[in-house]
């Protein structure tokens, strides 16, 4: 079982994720992304879904047209873990190569 990040671990890890923010009332992080169009957003979600399946760690997300809202938390640990940080870093890398909204 994975362990929940301590306050110090959380602070250190989140320094690498400036586009993510804390979810009020939860031990979770979130990010909203905008893409050029629906196809770009769906392609992003597909790449993340493949990685999430490999990790057996799945995001909470919501998609409308070119917007994707992502929330990460580890349910087994009831909070933020290293797995969330790893997936957030992957999401940032994929988003960096996508066509942004104009």
UniProtKB/Swiss-Prot annotation:
Enzyme Commission number(s) of this protein: 4.2.1.96
GO function terms (MF aspect): 4-alpha-hydroxytetrahydrobiopterin dehydratase activity
GO biological process, one term: tetrahydrobiopterin biosynthetic process
Gene3D superfamilies, sorted: Transcriptional coactivator/pterin dehydratase (3.30.1360.20)
Record InterPro entries: PCD_sf (IPR036428), Pterin_deHydtase (IPR001533)
Signal peptide range: none
Family classification: Belongs to the pterin-4-alpha-carbinolamine dehydratase family.
Name of protein: Putative pterin-4-alpha-carbinolamine dehydratase
The species this protein was found in: Burkholderia multivorans (strain ATCC 17616 / 249)
Top-level taxonomy: Bacteria, Pseudomonadati, Pseudomonadota, Betaproteobacteria, Burkholderiales
């Amino acid at each position: 079982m994975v362990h929940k990040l301590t306050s110090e671990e959380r602070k250190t890890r989140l320094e690498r994720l400036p586009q993510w923010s804390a979810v009020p009332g939860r031990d979770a992080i979130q990010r909203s992304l905008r893409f050029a169009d629906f196809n770009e957003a769906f392609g992003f979600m597909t790449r993340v879904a493949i990685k999430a399946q490999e990790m057996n760690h799945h995001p909470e997300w919501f998609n409308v047209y070119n917007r994707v809202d992502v929330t990460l938390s580890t349910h087994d640990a009831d909070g933020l873990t290293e797995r969330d940080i790893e997936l957030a870093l992957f999401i940032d890398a994929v988003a960096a190569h996508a066509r942004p909204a104009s």
